Amino acid sequence: IAIVDCSDYPKPVCSLEYMPLCGSDSKTYSNKCDFCNAFVDSNGTLSLSHFGKC
């Protein structure tokens, strides 16, 4: 199981760094910041499926 620590999120601005993560919603997030902001918005229901594109 892949785990990402989102304790420092949400952040108002994300970098443009591209390190894709695949969420449990089958959506590819461009980086940890994008994923963690979505995780916070989902009230913890979103999880990381795997590293890399979906």
Curated annotation (Swiss-Prot):
Entry protein name: Ovomucoid
CC terms in the record's Gene Ontology section: extracellular region
Site (Reactive bond 3): L16, E17
Gene Ontology MF terms in the entry: serine-type endopeptidase inhibitor activity
Domain Kazal-like residues, every copy: 4-54
UniProt keyword Secreted present: yes
Key words of the record: Disulfide bond, Glycoprotein, Protease inhibitor, Repeat, Secreted, Serine protease inhibitor
Residues with glycosylation annotation: N43
Gene3D superfamilies: 3.30.60.30
Location, primary (coarse class): secreted
